[in-house]
């Protein structure tokens, strides 16, 4: 049975105007002082949620639970299929086995899980290693925990692909006595999908210096080619050193419903994280969030397969259009996630523009992107491609006509 109001099984084509429907993505323009000029429709391409309906299996699971019992009393995970659904998903999508239910813990958010692991292994003022560019959620979480951020810059090779600088990482780890590193796998905001050998090398380097790894794998379902490699899966040592964070909220457009989970094989770390969460009553499972995950993971595989085709087409279209811009805007070839990190340095230098002016101009024609500077991209913008293909075509037509080729 289907409860979705959308006629099609998977509707990735309808342009959803979400203004006034409690959508931060649609109701907020993130560029201070910017506004959309009259005559241009809004094409929000900033914060990372999708302009697609969630999977029918998610709607079925939520409504099915409401129909089964309209009572929303105190809730327990037992009997929901929560653990089995997670293990099934990782087995089928990532070709890995999570053997023991106990290594899985409900988390109210990925960043909440990240924060707990930071607090387990470090004290206030201690350094935490991040890659740069980096996700703004990491910097905010580390700062909120009153720890010190140490950055290791990713380097771009001759093809523009972001690579880890292992020599620099080791230097930073030794000089700063790093005890915790945050790893984004795949990487946000660059969209880099790390190859297994890179993950292995990163883990080995951290193990060499007894650095604990927090691996944010919320984007792990958005791999354009091949399968995701969980950081904890590359070796037995990795299982002991890696605390991995996941959520179905990114994949199935459920960020507003809230809910995530961790996979932590280290018994001591897992116990301490649970103790910290208990102190604040933080990780109390949400009944509808859990049933949504079970519906997503048990029956949502086909939805994700079709979704990836749309994302891949959208990103490829944008990449192809940018190749006609004469090198003014650069990005690496899309590999994963549904965001791309656009480098406007050449454009700004040749046109005499500032990044503030570029962002204002993009918004003025309705293309609402995200300032890349908080992600440590000095002249960058992050674009979100989880929207109908027609919106991407229109957005990049406008950028070509009104930003790249126009005098302003």
Regions found by a protein language model. Give the residues of each.
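Conserved core segment of the aminotransferase class I/II
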Residues: 235-312, 319-321, 397
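Conserved core of the PLP fold type I
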Residues: 67, 71-204, 221-222, 226-236, ...
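Conserved glycine-rich beta-strand-loop-beta hairpin in the small C-terminal domain of fold type I
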Residues: 294, 310-319, 331-345, 379
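PLP-dependent enzyme catalytic core of the Aspartate aminotransferase-like
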Residues: 88, 350-408
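N-terminal small-domain helix-loop-helix segment of the aminotransferase-like
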Residues: 5-109, 116, 296, 406-408
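Helix C-cap/helix->beta junction micro-motif
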Residues: 145, 176, 208-209, 365, ...
